[in-house]
Amino acid sequence: MKILVTNDDGVRAPGIRSLAEALRNIGDVVVVAPDRERSAVGHALTLHHPLRASEIRPAVFAVDGTPTDCVNLGIHTLLGSRPDIVVSGVNCGGNMGDDITYSGTVSAAMEATLMGIPALAVSLATSGRGDNYAVASAFAARLVRIVSERGLPPDTLLNVNVPDLPLEKLGGAVVTIQGKRDYEGKIVTKTDPRGRNYYWIGNGSLQFRDLEGTDYYAVKRGLVSITPLHLDLTNYASLTTLKTWDFAEMTL
C-alpha cells in the first residue's frame, strides 16, 4: 500500500513525523508537506508562481506551497504513481466544527478526495504543543487499515479528532457530526515605529456548543471523533424555500 502523508504544520512538525513512523508499519510512506507552517490556509492553491520541492530525506519532500499544493505535487509528480490513500496530519490542535473551513489539514484530505483517492485528516485536540501524537498516529494507522479494506463512500473523507490523552485514558471512538463554534470576532490593532497600523486577527474567545453527537462533544469526553465529510456543499434543506422565490422578476 502506497501512502501519501501531508499536513499544514510543516514537514518538520512532530505530528507528521509521528504519523509517518506509524504508517511505515503498514505501507510505503512518502511525505510531501509544506516547508513551513501553513495553518489556516484552507484550500488555497498556488497558481501565480512556481513551486519548488526538495527531498530533504529519502521519501520526504519539503514544498514551498500549501497543503493542497503538496497533495497535487505528490499525486501527479513526486510519487511516480497514485497513492492508495492520503493521510493529512497529525495536526497540532483540533479541527472541529466550523473550523474545518479554515483548515489546511482538512483541505489537503479534500483535495485527495476530489481526485478520487481515499483520505483522512487527523488532528490532536490539544490546547498546547501536544503530548500524545503517538497515540493519535497509532489510531490513524488502524483506521487506514480499515479504510483500505472497506473503502469509503464516494466523495467522502474522514475528519478524525483525537483527544490529547494517554492511550489508557481514551474512551474509544465514535462517529460524529460536525459541531458548531460561536465566534467572537476581534481584531487587535497596533502601531509600528513608523506610525503605520498593523493588525492581528483572531484574538477573540472561541467556544464550541456542547451538542450531543458532535465532534466537540465526543472529544470533550475523551472519545476519538470520526466525522464523515463530503464535498457537496449544497444546502438541500433550503432548496424548497428558494424555489418559491420568483427569480424571473429580477432585472440585471
From Swiss-Prot:
- Give any GO molecular function from the UniProt entry: 5'-nucleotidase activity
What SUPFAM superfamilies does the record point to? SurE-like
UniProt keyword annotations, A-Z: Cytoplasm, Hydrolase, Metal-binding, Nucleotide-binding
Function, in words: Nucleotidase that shows phosphatase activity on nucleoside 5'-monophosphates.
Name-wise, this protein is 5'-nucleotidase SurE
Return the EC number: 3.1.3.5
Q: What class of enzyme is it?
A: hydrolase
